[in-house]
């Protein structure tokens, strides 16, 4: 595959550097791996990518496989009008970790293609029961906004960003203070009542 310089860097990041994957270079990020953040983190990333989980993502059980018809459809035609994710959800991984691991595996095994600004990847799980492999995931996305969203969550202000997003999702008006060293981390208002939030680390965990 002949890639542009930008797409070449994107593929390398997806293969080696995205958080929490099985790679020596990968960093750890609790906002991506911890179940307590999972729903808001995944929804945030979907929005940043211009996707909706209810419309564009189909989860299947970890013992299920993607139908041969769906697999052959995505292998045969690459539409660049929409992004889609079909993936087996494992109980040991968060939604984001499932997505990132799937993308990384499809690249590592060479079962992917680049069309314009899309990557489409396929994830087959080796099995003695099926010599062709078990069809576990199809990913057709624009990787650049995915990496941008991950970078924001991994930034020093990632926790504040995600908490502000979560509070807005449940109806709070969120104001970020002008002076964080002196004020609280977030100022909230809902139904005429005002609240303040301060984020603290305790024994390695953030609250």
Stretches found by the model and what they are:
Residues 1-158:
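Amphipathic alpha-helical interface elements
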Residues 96-99, 178, 189, 204:
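Generic detector of ordered secondary-structure context
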Residues 102-105, 161, 165, 195:
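Active-site-proximal helix/loop capping residues that flank conserved catalytic or ligand/cofactor
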Residues 115-116, 204-206:
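Short glycine-rich, flexible loops that bind phosphorylated cofactors or substrates
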Residues 154-178:
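Acidic-basic catalytic patches of nuclease active cores, encompassing PD-(D/E)XK
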Residues 167, 186-188, 192-205:
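Conserved catalytic cores of phosphodiester-cleaving nucleases, focusing on short active-site segments
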Residues 180-183:
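Short acidic/glycine-enriched loop/turn segments that link adjacent beta-strands
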């Amino acid at each position: 595959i002949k890639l542009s310089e930008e797409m070449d860097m994107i593929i390398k990041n997806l293969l080696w550097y995205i958080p929490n994957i099985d790679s020596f270079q990968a960093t750890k990020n609790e906002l991506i791996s911890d179940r307590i953040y999972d729903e808001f983190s995944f929804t945030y990333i979907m929005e940043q990518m211009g996707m909706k989980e209810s419309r564009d993502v189909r989860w299947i059980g970890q013992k299920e496989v993607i139908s041969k018809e769906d697999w052959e459809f995505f292998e045969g035609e690459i539409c660049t009008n929409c992004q889609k994710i079909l993936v087996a959800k494992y109980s040991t991984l968060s939604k984001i970790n499932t997505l990132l691991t799937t993308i990384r595996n499809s690249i590592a095994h060479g079962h992917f293609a680049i069309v314009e600004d899309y990557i489409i990847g396929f994830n087959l799980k080796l099995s003695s029961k099926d010599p062709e492999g078990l069809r576990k995931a199809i990913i057709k996305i624009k990787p650049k906004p995915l990496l941008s969203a991950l970078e924001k969550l991994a930034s020093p202000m990632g926790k504040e960003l995600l908490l502000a997003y979560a509070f807005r999702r449940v109806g709070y008006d969120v104001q970020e203070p002008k002076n964080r060293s002196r004020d609280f981390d977030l100022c909230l208002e809902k139904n005429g009542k005002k609240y303040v939030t301060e984020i603290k680390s305790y024994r390695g965990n953030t609250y």
